[in-house]
Amino acid sequence: MFKEAKLLTDALLLMALLWLISVVVALIEPRGTMARAGIVLGCAVGIAACLIGMPGESSTLSLGIRLSNTPVQFKLTAAALWLMFFGLLPAIFTARLGTNATSIGGRKCWYAGLGLTLLGAVGVLGLQDAMSFLIAWETMSIGGAVMIFGDGHAECPGTPVLFMLGLLEVGAVAILLALLLLGNQAGSCSFVGFHLANAAATPMSFLLGLLLLIGFGAKLGILPFYEWFPAAYGSGSGATGVVFSGIVLNAAFYALARGVLEWLPRVGIWTMSAAGIMIFAGVLTAILSIFNAFQEEDWRRMLSLSSAENAGVAVAVLGVSWLLLASGLPAQAALAWIVCLLHLAAHSLAKGTLFLTADGVNSMNGSYTIVQRGLLRNNPAVLGIGALFAAMSLAALPPMAGFVSEWYIFQTLFHGMQVKGLPARLTMTLAAAGLALVVAVALATFAKLFGIGLLGDGHVHTRRFARVRTAAIFILGSSVLVLAVGMPWWLHALGPASQAIFGVNAAAQMRDGWLLVPLSNKFAFISPTKMLVVCPLLALIPIALLLIGRRAFHVRRVPVWSGGRREDAREIATTSLAFSNALRTFYGFIYGPTHNLEREYDHGPYFVKRLIFNQEVAPIFGPYLFSPLVKAMRRVAETVSKLQSGYLNLYNALIGMLLVLILALALFYK
């Protein structure tokens, strides 16, 4: 046991050292090859460290420095190891493939940003004091911005990056305020003293819960913060999206979960109120995000909004766990907590697969637009298998890991009906209804992405995906199925994660042999492991019927029907807009769609030379929240700028007033 703990500690130190060296090397090396090798090796060491540590946790490692008179310590819990493992699996592939930036300088910048982001994410997962945690949080944000700048896909990347950083800094201020309030109550900046689980809930604890939700929700994309996702992701490459939707999202969620489940009170009406707000915020985020994802026509933007949707689902289930815990149901709360971890693991693998596919699509088509080009016809079958498994998981289709996590989510909500009180039960009911809508739209979204984005007649391109990319997509996509099929054994790694927080090993009650059960096999059960055996056998029936039928009925290929006229199938193929137009029209109160048709004439109004069609979807929060805030800040800036008068006496007076204020605080604040 001691040797394993020592090996785990050494592996974590080596991982961080490799990433730190890679950041420095990326800035001075001519081509960035060594930086890439260092980051890939660091990811491999990190994955090995997670495998060594699971199930269990790392020992507390002192880094030998102090911040604000608090020793900086590092420790990865069982949940942190789980999220780190499934975040690093896609990251190692994206580090190997790299960005598709055209310039060498851009690639070097991207690798430097990747190293910073990984260091920050691991710091968020493991650092044990407020000061170093905030440094890691900001490092993760800045690293992400550097990655987008390195990609160089947008003509003006500054606007989306600054919008992203601006909203993230709003969250950072909320986190800072929450940590200051918690530190003031604990008398220390160490997270060890933040444990107020047994304290009585007060309005202050309710405020702390909201601050944590706002702070970490800014990174997770909880409304209204998800509006930075499409622009920021759309300005970078798919490789950047892999990191953002993988280890970064996992780290932000873990920080939020640690805050609400370990730092805040677990009983009282104020706790239940904060949990209810978290549930509604998560469900509404998931609904709005997936609706907006469905109408997107860009791979990166669609997948980014899907990431916000999955983060919203995870936050909603986390709120359910908190509410169940406050209601005196620790076993059901532990079930919800483990379901969150399963959901994020499946999401990291599937989303990483599709972001890598998006970069391959860009290399073939020259853009990330979702359009039929028949890419699968000209590429190996393993590419389609990997992408299909990922799309099925995100659409919650059996037997993929996404289906397993969604099934567990609804079973958790059904268990949630055991709570006492009409408001709590009504919250569970509305959450179940909202998430059911999310699942339905997600199915349509990924049917559109896979069907239009990868299928078609196949007569446009003769090029193929790079072999390394094809292999990465297949391995990552297949790992989604491996996670689902091996779920009875994977759950063993999550027992300590629930035991440490809830005092209940819920993972042991979530499996019965090859069956997956929600705490009891008398409530419900599924078995992805058995599905893998049975489904291929059942598939033999339609395959046999097809083979028999082909003897009597020969295959005919005829042109697509188009009003009785012969049209080029490529010209009348289903477009992304056509696929989503029905839902866009039905839910027009959400989308606020606008269409604009302009005509250019030649020699009079009867001779149309060109039609220009433009369609847009009105943003929900932009005109009503962000724009008024920007205008208000500009007015404040104009008012404050009058203080810059150039008169030295005025400046001295302001300094004197500030000193008096500081003295007053020192004398009267207790």
Language-model features and meaning:
Residues 2-14, 20-112, 188-196, 496, ...:
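Transmembrane helix-loop-helix hairpins at membrane boundaries of multipass inner-membrane proteins
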Residues 223, 351-355, 428-464, 533-558:
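Predominantly late transmembrane helices and immediately cytosolic-facing juxtamembrane segments
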Residues 59-68, 192-197, 408-422, 490-524:
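Membrane-interfacial helical/loop segments at transmembrane boundaries in membrane proteins
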Residues 62-65, 93, 160, 164, ...:
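Short helix-boundary/re-entrant hairpin motifs in multi-pass inner-membrane proteins
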Residues 11-28, 40-54, 83-100, 117-121, ...:
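Central hydrophobic cores of alpha-helical transmembrane segments in multi-pass inner-membrane proteins
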Residues 490-535, 547-670:
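Aromatic-capped, Gly/Pro-kinked transmembrane alpha-helices
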Residues 4-6, 66-82, 196-209, 274, ...:
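Short aromatic-rich membrane-water interface segments that cap or initiate transmembrane helices
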Residues 28-34, 110-207, 291-369:
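Alpha-helical multi-pass transmembrane bundles of energy-transducing inner-membrane proteins
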